[in-house]
């Protein structure tokens, strides 16, 4: 896990980011990737953008919406989400999130499983021409 900075008191420090990447839909920052059974990311989706409709064979995901509003689709069922909402995505479920607001949609993603590589992503639909295996 990353080493914290600051005083160690609540609100007194932050975790140092491990990896940052920009994508066509926004960006993500890896917050924790050293455990063998989970990985934690902060994900930002720009207004009007959405992630690919995808599946994972070796991990589940839990999303906690920090700010903004959007729609989450799991196995073809879409539900609205906003700050404070949480979503559980089982292993193998087809899923995506879309920003339906006019501000960034920010959420924390906790992946749980035994493998977190890009090749455990099967993109069923993608707005940016990336459909197919990761």
Regions found by a protein language model. Give the residues of each.
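A short, N-terminal "cap"/entry segment at the start of jelly-roll beta-barrel domains
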Residues: 1-39, 46, 52, 121-134
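Short histidine-centered beta-strand/loop micro-motifs
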Residues: 31-33, 41-43, 51-56, 64, ...
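A generic "binding-loop/recognition-motif" signal
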Residues: 49, 58-59, 77, 93, ...
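Short beta-strand segments
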Residues: 51, 77-79, 120
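Short beta-strand His + acidic residue motifs that chelate non-heme Fe in jelly-roll/DSBH
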Residues: 52-54, 72-73, 89, 95-101, ...
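Glycine- and acidic-residue-biased ligand/ion/polar-headgroup-sensing regions
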Residues: 58-71, 75-76
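A short hydrophobic beta-strand segment most commonly corresponding to one strand
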Residues: 62, 102-123
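Short acidic-glycine-tyrosine-enriched beta hairpin
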Residues: 76-94
């Amino acid at each position: 896990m990353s080493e914290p900075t600051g005083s160690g008191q609540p609100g007194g420090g932050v975790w140092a980011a491990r990896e940052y990447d920009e994508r066509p839909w926004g960006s993500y920052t890896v917050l924790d990737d050293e455990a063998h059974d989970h990985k934690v990311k902060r994900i930002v989706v720009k207004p009007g953008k959405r992630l690919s409709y995808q599946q994972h064979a070796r991990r589940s995901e839990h999303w906690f919406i920090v700010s903004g509003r959007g729609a989450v689709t799991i196995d073809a069922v879409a539900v609205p989400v906003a700050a404070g909402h949480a979503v559980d995505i089982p292993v193998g479920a087809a899923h995506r999130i879309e920003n339906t607001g006019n501000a960034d949609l920010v959420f924390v993603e906790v992946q749980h499983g035994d493998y977190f590589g890009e090749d455990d992503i099967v993109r069923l639909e993608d707005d940016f021409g990336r459909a197919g295996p990761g």
